[in-house]
A protein has these predicted regions:
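Cyclophilin-like peptidyl-prolyl cis-trans isomerases
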Residues: 1-193
């Protein structure tokens, strides 16, 4: 997979690049996988986790202030920061290291209107079209910082999301990550599609 980081979210972008360059993410697990929702990783405790060990509480000892940007939303392939819940984190500050990649689902106009009514959200025509065609998780918009997106290899999300999981949505077979920063990467031209 190749992920593009957004310049509109500089704190998250810079932190992610630092952790990738430091090798922090190498050999960590995608420890929480929910089909039709997302795949989550980045827990530093997952590197040497025993089979069946509960994960998700590990962190770097700091958070990142939320960077909510209109136009950056939870479409399929979005890279977003995990965080603690509103009850202990009303500022919606992001985890210093945990992240997720959105798989999501296709949303009809009626389903999207239900989300708007229930959560008091309003989606743009572009968002509605995206959620109706490629899918995503619109109910997370404005609650978690989206700071990048998959630009190549999005099918890997589907493959990981399809693995068999046990308690706490942890894959029964470890799914490890390895990351590096690509310099001078030329994004593929998808205008022909």
């Amino acid at each position: 997979m190749v992920v593009k980081l957004y310049n509109e979210t500089p704190k998250h972008r810079d932190n992610f690049i630092k952790l990738v360059n430091d090798g922090t993410y190498n050999d960590l697990l995608f420890h929480r996988v929910i089909n039709k929702f997302m795949i989550q990783g980045g827990d530093p405790n997952s590197r040497d986790a025993k089979p069946g060990q509960m994960l998700g509480d590990g962190d770097m000892g700091y958070t990142i202030p939320a960077e909510f940007v209109p136009g950056l939303y939870h479409k399929k392939g979005a890279l977003a920061a995990a965080r603690q819940g509103d009850d202990v984190n009303p500022q919606k500050a992001s985890s210093g290291c945990q992240f997720y990649l959105v798989q999501g689902d296709i949303w009809t106009a009626d389903r999207l209107k239900m989300v708007e009514a229930r959560m008091g959200k309003s989606f743009t025509a572009e968002q509605a079209e995206t959620y109706a065609t490629i899918g995503g998780t619109p109910f997370l918009d404005g609650d978690y910082t989206v700071f990048g997106e998959v630009v190549e290899g999005i099918e890997v999300i589907d493959k990981i999301a399809a693995v068999q999981c046990g308690p706490m949505d942890r894959p029964l077979q470890d799914v490890k990550m390895k990351m590096s920063v690509l310099k001078n990467y030329k994004e593929p031209d998808n205008s022909q599609k």
